[in-house]
């Protein structure tokens, strides 16, 4: 990690392969919190390249728990940005209700608030929604209400290793 951090500190970018590999290594707890915090801080200071985003995305797709909601549903995800840092209300969750109410199928993806007071999971738990990764339950939610929720920790358990660092940052 030290070599990667040194390169990034010198304004270099990671290749697709490096990005994918390092995210998988971070998720397997290969690095300490200081190294992970340094790595994450770099991406708060500069925008990632297309190759970095693609590598991170593909690593997350490889590591995630997959479900099949069937071909009966074409859904849209109205995932928010993860907090605006201004403690405004959770717009993406409310938007999901509006879109589902208009007749579209919504598969919302989100988490508890990290950089704000109120993430999508906070809102939905408060409203009594059961957070689940049970495929049959999620299909029923879509079928009956036009809305189902994918609580990120249930679908991306590998990211638990960075949760406390993200919260601290």
Stretches found by the model and what they are:
Residues 80, 84-140:
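A generic, well-ordered mixed alpha/beta core segment in the N-terminal half of proteins
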Residues 74-77, 104-107, 122, 146-153:
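Structural motif
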Residues 67, 71, 127, 151-153:
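Short alpha-helix boundary/capping motifs
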Residues 25, 42-45, 117-127, 133-136, ...:
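Short, structured segments at the rim of ligand-binding sites
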């Amino acid at each position: 990690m030290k070599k990667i951090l040194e390169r990034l500190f010198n304004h270099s970018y990671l290749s697709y392969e490096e990005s994918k590999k390092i995210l998988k290594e971070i998720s397997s707890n290969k690095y300490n919190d200081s190294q992970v915090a340094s790595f994450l801080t770099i991406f708060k200071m500069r925008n990632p390249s297309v190759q970095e985003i693609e590598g991170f995305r593909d690593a997350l797709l490889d590591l995630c728990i997959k479900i099949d909601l069937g071909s009966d549903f074409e859904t849209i995800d109205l995932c928010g940005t993860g907090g605006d840092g201004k403690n405004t209300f959770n717009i993406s969750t409310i938007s999901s209700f509006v879109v589902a109410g208009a007749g579209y199928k919504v598969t919302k993806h989100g988490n508890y608030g990290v950089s704000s007071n109120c993430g999508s999971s906070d809102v939905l738990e408060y409203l009594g929604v059961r957070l689940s990764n049970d495929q049959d339950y999620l299909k029923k939610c879509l079928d009956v209400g036009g809305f189902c929720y994918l609580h990120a920790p249930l679908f991306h358990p590998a990211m638990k290793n960075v949760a406390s660092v993200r919260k601290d940052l």
